[in-house]
């Protein structure tokens, strides 16, 4: 146990550190109007390491003790800031009772060590009691509760007053010390203590559960989860589906006493700092050199932009030969359009959705898996193993109360949700994703919990046709999917295995030559095939930096095509709705982004129309679009485009 002198020295050095490095935050807290609130004071662990390495080491090795001292130091630093404001700024702040130091460990040595930043599945007893970090996705968010925090007690013998803190391990129970903790010249031997009236501090309290990110796990590895406790200012800062990095102290929680059931200790992380990483996804690993590389690539293809575009598209699922239309559709779906708010205040989604309908062996699942690799956040599921609750949210009972656990669409918020074998889902399960696809949210009313969760998700589905595909019938008949669901997909591509001997010969030659091509390929040559990491960063970059605007010419082309489709005697009622017009705009914007532009040109509008035409079983402007399965890359696409215009 520390002596009073050591404690005062630590608090003094902590106070000095806070006043020196964080005067602006202290000033903001002082000017805040509510004295009853709990205020966070964010500090950087890397700064603490540079300024006072020994103190940083002590905070790491015994965070429970030293973080309490840091909170006391924050109150002292706040009082110094109040005095400074009164003296030099002639402003009177309001004294606050509750300030909590929140240590951001990102960018510090703790982030680079597997001992202090393990995956959730590798958390062990050795991590107990140190400051550590965990990364995961919030899958469950409990209700905000209140608990009694520290409480003052008085020794009957020497009248010494001291605080007792509740033990979260034993369900917030208060355990009195065996003897008086007064540290005077002569030790007190008192063992009886009385609570002091009106000295209880109450805190907000919330339990969440975070799960390992499935994308970093190997095949067949079950993602592990851990309980995280949020207190005071941290409560209600995250919701189900958020990606978070949590810094805190690992401890354990006793299970409830049940007859004939063995008591277990459940690992639990008491959070000190929570950082949402959803917004940071698009900024990862895009260096200035890489941006310059992208610009040089498009400078090289200034006169032949479509050839440059095709070089990018060849990098999508390179093991599958041809299928140009599908690869273009995958790229446009992942890039997406620009979300905007119309005159009535309604949000019009920017995310596109894609459905692949095809015979077995046409590469549908390959595209799904590759798209999941390209996306910064992806959830893959199959229709047979998915229920409405598994796709949206599940109401689960934990400790006598209900809470919501996130499903696939909520976990994929801000990313991609791939649903293979779409036709295997039951009809009422498919109906639950209607709202998620169009309104980008899920409204829930389960077990007395009524809420709305965000699902800004790209839905990528793959399905087999119902029996033999009949070109004379509508998509609804061939796939057994309802019209409202089909209209929500921007692109619906049909891949039919027509057993064409010429095509089979070309494909077999490609597969046999694949090994030799792979050996001869240069890694840095972007003019042939782009590697997966480069594609990921390119898609992230264009989504973040380009917000294309429609030119007058593009508007006229899209509007004329939409009117032509509506007038066509052969149009599909399920597809030719206002949603088709919105899909055309999104796809044209996505193509402009793919072409590294901020304006939607005539070429982008025509490409969007050709994608929609490929989705139509009966075309309104072209006699036959051909089979998407047999669409190959053109050697001279720019010359073909000029001929097409004339």
UniProtKB/Swiss-Prot annotation:
Keyword DNA repair: yes
Span of domain MCM: 308-511
Zinc finger (C4-type): 155-188
Domain of life: Eukaryota
Binding-site residues for ATP, renumbered to this chain: 358-365
Gene3D superfamilies: 2.20.28.10, mini-chromosome maintenance (MCM) complex, chain A, domain 1 (3.30.1640.10), Nucleic acid-binding proteins (2.40.50.140), P-loop containing nucleotide triphosphate hydrolases (3.40.50.300)
This enzyme's EC code(s): 3.6.4.12
Function according to Swiss-Prot or TrEMBL: Probable DNA helicase that may play a role in DNA repair during meiosis.
This protein's name: Probable DNA helicase MCM9
Species this protein is from: Arabidopsis thaliana (Mouse-ear cress)
């Amino acid at each position: 146990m520390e002596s009073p002198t050591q404690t005062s020295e630590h608090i003094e050095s902590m106070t000095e550190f806070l006043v020196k490095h964080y005067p602006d935050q202290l000033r903001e807290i002082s000017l805040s109007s509510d004295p009853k609130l709990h205020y966070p004071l964010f500090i950087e662990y890397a700064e603490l390491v540079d300024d006072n390495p020994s103190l940083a080491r002590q905070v790491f090795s015994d965070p429970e003790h030293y973080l309490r001292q840091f909170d006391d130091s924050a109150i002292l630093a706040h009082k110094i800031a109040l005095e400074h404001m009164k003296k030099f700024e002639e402003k009177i702040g309001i004294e606050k009772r509750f300030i909590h130091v929140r240590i951001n460990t990102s960018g510090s040595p703790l982030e680079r060590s597997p001992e202090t930043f393990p995956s959730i599945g590798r958390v062990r007893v050795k991590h107990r009691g140190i400051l550590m970090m965990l990364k995961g996705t919030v899958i469950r968010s409990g209700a905000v509760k209140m608990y009694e925090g520290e409480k003052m007690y008085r020794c009957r013998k020497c009248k010494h007053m001291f605080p007792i803190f509740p033990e979260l391990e034993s369900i917030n129970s208060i355990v009195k010390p065996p003897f008086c903790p007064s540290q005077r010249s002569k030790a007190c031997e008192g063992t009886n203590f009385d609570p002091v009236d009106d000295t209880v501090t109450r805190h907000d309290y919330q339990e969440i559960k975070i799960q390992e990110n499935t994308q970093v796990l190997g095949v067949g590895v079950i993602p592990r989860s851990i309980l995280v406790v949020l207190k005071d200012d941290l409560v209600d800062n995250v919701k189900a589906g958020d990606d978070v990095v949590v810094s805190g102290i690992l401890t354990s929680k006793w299970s409830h006493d049940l007859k004939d059931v063995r008591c277990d200790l459940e690992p639990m992380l008491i959070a000190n700092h929570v950082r949402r990483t959803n917004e940071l996804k698009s900024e990862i690993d895009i260096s200035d050199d890489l941006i310059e590389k992208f610009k040089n690539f498009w400078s090289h293809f200034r006169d032949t932009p479509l050839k440059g575009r095709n070089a990018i598209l060849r990098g999508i699922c390179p093991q599958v030969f041809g299928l140009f239309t599908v690869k273009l559709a995958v790229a446009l779906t992942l890039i997406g359009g620009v979300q905007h708010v119309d005159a009535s205040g309604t949000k019009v989604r920017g995310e596109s959705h894609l459905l692949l309908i095809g015979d077995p062996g046409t590469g549908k699942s390959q595209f799904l898996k590759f798209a999941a690799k390209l996306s910064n956040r992806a959830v893959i599921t199959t229709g047979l193993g998915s229920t409405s609750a598994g796709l949206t949210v599940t109401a689960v009972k934990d400790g006598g109360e209900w809470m919501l656990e996130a499903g696939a669409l909520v976990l994929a918020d801000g990313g991609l949700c791939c649903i293979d074998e779409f036709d295997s889902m039951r009809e009422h399960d498919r109906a639950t994703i209607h709202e998620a696809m169009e309104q980008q949210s899920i409204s829930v009313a389960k077990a007395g919990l009524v809420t709305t969760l965000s699902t800004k998700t790209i839905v990528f589905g793959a399905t087999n046709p119902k029996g033999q595909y009949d070109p004379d019938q509508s998509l609804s008949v061939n796939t057994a999917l309802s019209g409202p669901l089909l209209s929500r997909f921007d692109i619906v591509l049909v891949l039919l295995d027509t057993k064409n001997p010429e095509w089979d010969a070309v494909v077999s030659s490609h597969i046999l030559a694949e090994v030799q091509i792979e050996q001869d390929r240069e890694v840095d040559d972007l003019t042939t095939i782009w590697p997966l990491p480069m594609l990921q960063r390119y898609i992230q970059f264009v989504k973040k930096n380009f917000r294309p605007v429609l030119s007058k010419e593009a508007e006229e082309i899209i509007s004329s095509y939409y009117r032509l489709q509506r007038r066509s005697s052969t149009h599909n009622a399920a597809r030719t709705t206002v949603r088709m017009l919105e899909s055309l705009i999104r796809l044209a914007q996505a193509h402009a982004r793919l072409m590294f532009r901020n304006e939607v040109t005539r070429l982008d509008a025509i490409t969007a129309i050709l994608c929609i035409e490929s989705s139509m079983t009966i075309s309104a402007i072209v006699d036959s679009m051909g089979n998407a399965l047999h669409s190959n890359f053109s050697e001279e696409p720019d010359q073909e485009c000029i001929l097409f215009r004339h």
